[in-house]
Amino acid sequence: MAPRKTVGILGGGQLGRMLTHPAALLGIPLLILDSGSYTPAKQTLLPPPPHSHPDGPFTSETHIRKLASACDILTVEIEHVNADVLEAVEKEGLCEVQPSPQTIRLIQNKYDQKKYLAERGVAVAPFEELPANPTEEDFKAIAGRLGLPLMLKAKTLAYDGRGNSPLKSASSGDIQASLKFLGDRPLYAEGWAPFVKEVAVMVVRNKEGEVRSYDAVETIHRESILRVCLAPLRGEKGVNQRARELAEKAVGHLEGAGIFGVEMFLMPDGELLLNEIAPRPHNSGHHTIEACLTSQFENHLRAILSLPLGSTALRVPSAAMVNILGASSTMDAIDKMADNALTVPGAAVHLYGKAESRKARKMGHITVTAESDAELNERLRALLFAQPDAHADWIDLIAPPSPAPAHSHAKPLVGIIMGSDSDLPVMHPATKILEKFGVPYELTITSAHRTPERMVKYAKTAADRGLRAIIAGAGGAAHLPGMVASETSLPVIGVPVKASVLDGVDSLYSIVQMPRGIPCATVGINNSTNAALLAVRILGTSVPALNKATEEYSKALEEEVLAKADILEEEGWDKYIERLKK
């Protein structure tokens, strides 16, 4: 293997720290420019001999040039760098820069970024530039065009909500309050986006322009700071894929290689609007370290070094990331959250090695993985309730508690549906089997004939909502199981319900005789117990604990039959049959 090129990183914070991990595994020499000799990134990887990690501001021309002279490629862990110097360094042939200085400069100015993307057909919220030193009349005029409320945004040096101020009215008081908050910075206004979810997609791009996206995630903020990411994004059919396509389209219009964090809004009508892009590893991609086949950090290095891009696929069905934020100037709360996470199955702690804590400072994060959304829910609740600012109402919205008995789970793996409430007595045993195995489920009524649109929507959205199997009960014409099977990629198990005529044989024939290409499993008449057991076995192919549980269930059945045989043979069948009559 040829010697790896030396990579210089502008910025020595937590993102640089997490870049050092794959760099060490791949034998990639790193030099890190930041002020201080013991920054988070400098703690975890020694510099290649005979160099030392340079000590100085990552915006300094002198220090950037010195770093460039010792490296083959420069990259960034923060976009607030001197793009002009980076461009000069590259033009002079001192060092390659990735992503390109032009892209970094474009992204540094959020207005220019938004304008550039909008001109290339990327969906964004309506926006307008504010003149320098805007007057109250300027604000009122723009409010008249964009409507109220609207969001005022600083063009530059804005992150974690620090450059955003909502303008709720065109009153002098509200305008002056926003100006005071935003300071003396160039501004633009953006139409209000009443989103239902905030979404992020990590996209890696190599030097040849190939782009690969990771699964979209839901990002949950509190006081404008990212607190939790949930992966993959759940929702209406195709929203994950549409988010990935939008992110890939946007990054495809940029120059240079590396990882990009693309943030967007999911609107009530299902439309996705791009919010902003970061030209570097991003907080919303931290889960990829444990949850994906290749982390965002490794793929960033692969991309800028022209190494083969790694797979972006999830290695687990469900994952989350929880930020560890400082609560005060002491490390007590940080240590408590980290120690608590060590008791949660599937949790991995990442502390950033920052010497000082302060309120709302990002001090670390926790990744948690699980075999299902429901399992993730329980683990996530354990992590969130350990935070010093835990609020039960907020946590319940993110990770709902287990449902009351005989109510649907918020994160089901199996859906139980029936065409009529009269089918409930037949389908009820399925719920008991699923409860016995600890499988979260939902139960509802949808008719193939009386509520066809509801049935189609249920089937089409089932997989994206996290379901992995559907049990459908129907009698008479019994079209529900087959129709659902034709509208979903999930396995569907039909339960023929015995109606008032023909003893359910008509239902059985209807379900079992689906045309070629539309498989629909069918169990015995009125036998929802077997339908549930089959659903558990289907889940067991990917959840080892359920596979083991089904083996134990079968063993218990065997032992039950053997015990009956022993009694029968011991006391005789005449006495045994009398026992049965009782």
UniProtKB/Swiss-Prot annotation:
It holds the Pfam family PurK_C. Disulfide bonds: none annotated. ATP binds at residues 143-200. The keyword Lyase applies. One of its GO terms (molecular function) is ATP binding. This is Phosphoribosylaminoimidazole carboxylase. Keywords: ATP-binding, Decarboxylase, Lyase, Nucleotide-binding, Purine biosynthesis. The keyword ATP-binding applies. The gene is ADE2. GO terms for biological process: 'de novo' IMP biosynthetic process. Residues 114-305 form the ATP-grasp domain. In the C-terminal section; belongs to the AIR carboxylase family. Class I subfamily. Pathway: Purine metabolism; IMP biosynthesis via de novo pathway; 5-amino-1-(5-phospho-D-ribosyl)imidazole-4-carboxylate from 5-amino-1-(5-phospho-D-ribosyl)imidazole (carboxylase route): step 1/1. Its EC number is 4.1.1.21. It catalyses: 5-amino-1-(5-phospho-D-ribosyl)imidazole-4-carboxylate + H(+) = 5-amino-1-(5-phospho-beta-D-ribosyl)imidazole + CO2. InterPro entries: Ade2_fungi/plant, ATP-grasp, ATP-grasp_carboxylate-amine, ATP_grasp_subdomain_1, PreATP-grasp_dom_sf, PurE_ClassI, PurE_dom, PurK.
